[in-house]
Each structure stands twice: as structure tokens, then as C-alpha cells.
């Protein structure tokens, strides 16, 4: 570990990140573990829970997503959930040990007509003693401020992949559209949850590029989710080759080094991994997971499995 590893840097070069990414695995893990020990000495693992508050029918054509109206995945579009149903889910999440509750809506952007109801959800979940997070697509001027006023802590808006590979995955929006919405959320004083998806056919250079783009956000995202692609029948990426677990762990270790003070979340795709593979990713630097049996429309490990996983790596809950 170098002294620069202890302080978040806004001046990472792509070449520097690539050099770290390509380190022998033992050296990479040793460096990541030293950073994790310096900033997260208790070894605790933060737990979030995710709920789809509006499922299906999205106008975007993200090649990985079951909720796009562009693909035949068998998923039916649904209306925005009642506030009471969302609050009930938040209470169950808290009872299960989650300290952050994330609400996701499948649409291109937040419409002003839906803003009051979403704001009510945020306020109600916040009143239950949970941190709040939403993922609502692109934001227009003034919307982020309204969400902040309602009590929003985090806005999730992933960059997905590198700038160069982005148009291979989605063509209904641009990489810079994502950057613009992140800027709106940050300007309103909302913390950022921003990461990407690995295993979409991208190269290692693209993974380096994603991490580099994230490092240019100032300040860094407070939460960096690292997702492993869950191939879904009917989507363009349904037949993607499965990402190697060691490659996923390598990416997580690099994220831990580049984002020393951020939560690095082992996110989607855990249900396809062995307990040993998940433990490796936590040991490599991840200190946050999603709990609950579903992540929007994909499966997630059962609570008892996660309890055994966290016990095996010695990671309790950070705030519970």
C-alpha cells in the first residue's frame, strides 16, 4: 500500500488504474486489504434492500434489462406501487437487518406527475429509521432538490460500462446523459450510488475505463455497486459468457483501492455465485451487499444463506 492509497484521489489516470488491475492477484489483494483495514477496520458489511416500486414497460433499450419494453422477456408492465406497500416492505427490510432501503422504478426519467408520490415514499421510509435510496432514471431541473427535501440520502444512477463500450449496451441514451443526471443529484446535496455491470462482453480495458470514469466524479460516489451480469432470456445479452469470479474479485479490489472511503457493494449476480466466490469478493474489498430474495426482477440469496456468508467472513452489519 502506498500513502496515496489512504486518501481519495481525483487525478487517477487510466494507465495507473490499468497497472493496478493487472497486478498479480496476491499483490492486488494485499494492497486492497490494507486500504480496507485502514478505512473500515471493523470489517462490517453494510446491508441494503432493494424494491421495484414500478416494474416493466421501460422505454430504454438497455441490453441487460428484463424491464425494457423493447424485448420480449415475459415481464408485464405494472403501475407505481401504493405507498403503504412500500412502507411495509421497508419495515420488513429493517427487521431483516437492512439499514438502507432502495426503491427502483422502470422508466426513462422521473415524470413530474409521479414526483409527489415518490417523495411521499421517501419520507415514509425515512420515518422508519432507514437510509433512503432511489433509482428513477434521468432527472430534470428541480427534481433532485424535491427528492432531497423529501429526505433522500442516495441517488443510484450507474454508468454501466466504459464510455467506449456504452453504445454497444444501450442506444436510447448517451454516457453523458448519465453524467448530467449524476451532476443534478450531487448539486442538490444527494449522495451518489454509482457503479457498473461486468460480464456484458466488455474487455478488461473497458472495466478499467469504467472505474476511471467513476474516479473522475468529484467527490467520488459514496457507494460503488459492482454488478455481475445476470443473463435474462429475451434480452440481447441473454447468451453472454459468464464472468469469471476471479475477474469480478479483481475488479472489486481495484475499486477498493481507487475508492478507499466508499462503500463497494457486491451487488447483482450473487445468486449465481458460490458462497466461496462471494466470500472472496468480500475479502477482496467489498463491504456492502443487497439482502432480500429479489433485486428488482432477479433472484438474490436467501437471508439464511447471507447470514452464514457473513458469519464465515466475520462481517456483521455496519449499523444494525
Curated annotation (Swiss-Prot):
Cofactor note: Binds 1 [4Fe-4S] cluster. The cluster is coordinated with 3 cysteines and an exchangeable S-adenosyl-L-methionine. Binds 1 [2Fe-2S] cluster. The cluster is coordinated with 3 cysteines and 1 arginine.
GO MF, one example: iron ion binding
Taxonomy, superkingdom: Bacteria
Cofactor section: [4Fe-4S] cluster; [2Fe-2S] cluster
Residues given in the record as [2Fe-2S] cluster binding sites: 102, 133, 193, 265
Keyword Cytoplasm: no
Residues where [4Fe-4S] cluster binds: 58, 62, 65
SUPFAM superfamilies xref list: Radical SAM enzymes (SSF102114)
Pathway the protein contributes to: Cofactor biosynthesis; biotin biosynthesis; biotin from 7,8-diaminononanoate: step 2/2
Catalytic activity: (4R,5S)-dethiobiotin + (sulfur carrier)-SH + 2 reduced [2Fe-2S]-[ferredoxin] + 2 S-adenosyl-L-methionine = (sulfur carrier)-H + biotin + 2 5'-deoxyadenosine + 2 L-methionine + 2 oxidized [2Fe-2S]-[ferredoxin]
Keyword list, A-Z: 2Fe-2S, 4Fe-4S, Biotin biosynthesis, Iron, Iron-sulfur, Metal-binding, S-adenosyl-L-methionine, Transferase
One GO term of the biological process aspect: biotin biosynthetic process
PANTHER family: BIOTIN SYNTHASE, BIOTIN SYNTHASE, MITOCHONDRIAL
Physiological role: Catalyzes the conversion of dethiobiotin (DTB) to biotin by the insertion of a sulfur atom into dethiobiotin via a radical-based mechanism.
Assembly and oligomerization: Homodimer.
Family indicated by similarity: Belongs to the radical SAM superfamily. Biotin synthase family.
Protein name: Biotin synthase
